[in-house]
Amino acid sequence: MLAATVPAAAQAPAAPPSPPPSSVPVPGDLELSKLVWSTLAAIDAANEAGNYSVLRDLASPQFQAMNDAAKLTQVFASLRASRLDLSNTLLLAPTFTATPRFVQPGILMLKGFFGLRPTPVAFELYYQWVMGRWKLAGVSITPASIASQEPALSQQPAAAPPRRRN
């Protein structure tokens, strides 16, 4: 399993989720999709160029403080080596596997996947509300198996065909 994850501080805490602070807007469906698309496009461009400075500059101040461009190069090395084309995620709407929620005041978690073939892309993204904008605060991207992303089919055996009477 390939993963790119940063930073631990942005991961979901053990405490139950808190409601969003009143000054933090709750994004609508289109805004949620745009956050995911823009993040994956930025990561794809960084992987192509081997330069993560723009991705870092687009992120939250806490993310920037914890990750310089060299560290991000290391963090995303396995994803880059997999040559997974994240630009294909721009062709589909993300499928959310969990309801987008606030895991800390001002920290929004989005979890889901893109049902691409042959390799779906799973994501877990964290955003922080900073100066009137959502900024990347944490990221995990993994290639996923198709079977793990599709709803389980019924395990009932097929009915035997009726017997013909002569």
Regions found by a protein language model. Give the residues of each.
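Compositionally biased, proline/threonine/alanine/serine-rich low-complexity intrinsically disordered stretches
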Residues: 4-34, 80, 143-166
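Generic detector of short, well-ordered, non-transmembrane alpha-helical segments enriched
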Residues: 6-7, 51, 121
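Localized chelating/binding microdomains
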Residues: 43, 64, 86, 137-141, ...
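Exposed beta-sheet edge and beta->alpha loop/turn motif
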Residues: 94-166
